[in-house]
């Protein structure tokens, strides 16, 4: 069987951190690669929150749109190998978010998102069952942002994804790292850009 490839020029450390978190949350997570620009690859990874996370690296992918096991990709990045595993295209849940066209709606201070996540975690501990936090908590809208006639709700699942994937800097992070998140929208898609990656959610049609 053929093997997919990804050659990384820079950004491997950040991608490794995201993949390690994603695999820690879901050992069966799937990664998908898009050649965003001639020398930039956007790596998407599934999460248990019905949210797709993404991070960009400088490099080239052997086959644009290829999907592989996130665990296989993680091991390859750790080892510095270009071979990243066998194709898993059939396991990817739906379409990728658009590559461009998103409208910036608002900028949120990191501490606001962290406070929301803390409250959400407390509720999750209080009401979680054997299957984890209840679906109603994940769907709950915790913020509404709007600009130029466009309004979107931010569900708790996006907040949980940002914090559980380590996309938000901690208090000890260097001061040159931004302390805000940007919320953007395009059609049914909502995107939150954090300092260490982005998360996407389809607001009207579930990815999973």
Label each region the model flagged:
Residues 44, 52-60, 199-207:
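Short amphipathic beta-strand/extended segments with alternating polar/hydrophobic composition
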Residues 52-85:
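A broadly used, surface-exposed interaction patch
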Residues 73-208:
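Long, compositionally biased intrinsically disordered terminal regions
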């Amino acid at each position: 069987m053929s093997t997919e490839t990804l050659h990384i020029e820079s950004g491997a450390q950040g991608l490794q951190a995201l993949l390690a978190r994603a695999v820690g949350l879901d050992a069966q997570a799937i990664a998908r690669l898009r050649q965003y620009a001639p020398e930039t690859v956007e790596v998407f990874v599934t999460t248990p929150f019905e949210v797709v996370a993404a991070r960009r690296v400088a490099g080239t992918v052997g086959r644009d749109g290829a999907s592989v096991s996130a665990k296989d990709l993680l091991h390859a990045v750790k080892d510095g190998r270009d071979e990243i595993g066998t194709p898993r295209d059939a396991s990817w849940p739906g379409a990728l978010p658009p590559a461009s066209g998103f409208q910036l709606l608002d900028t949120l201070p990191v501490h606001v998102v962290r406070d929301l996540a803390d409250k959400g975690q407390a509720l999750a501990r209080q009401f979680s069952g054997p299957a984890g936090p209840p679906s109603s908590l994940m769907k709950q809208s915790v913020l509404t942002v709007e600009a130029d006639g466009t309004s979107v709700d931010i569900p708790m699942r996006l907040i949980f994804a940002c914090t559980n994937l380590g996309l938000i800097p901690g208090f000890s992070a260097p001061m040159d790292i931004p302390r805000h998140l940007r919320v953007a929208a395009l059609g049914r898609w909502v995107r939150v850009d954090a300092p260490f990656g982005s998360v996407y959610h389809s607001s009207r049609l579930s990815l999973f």
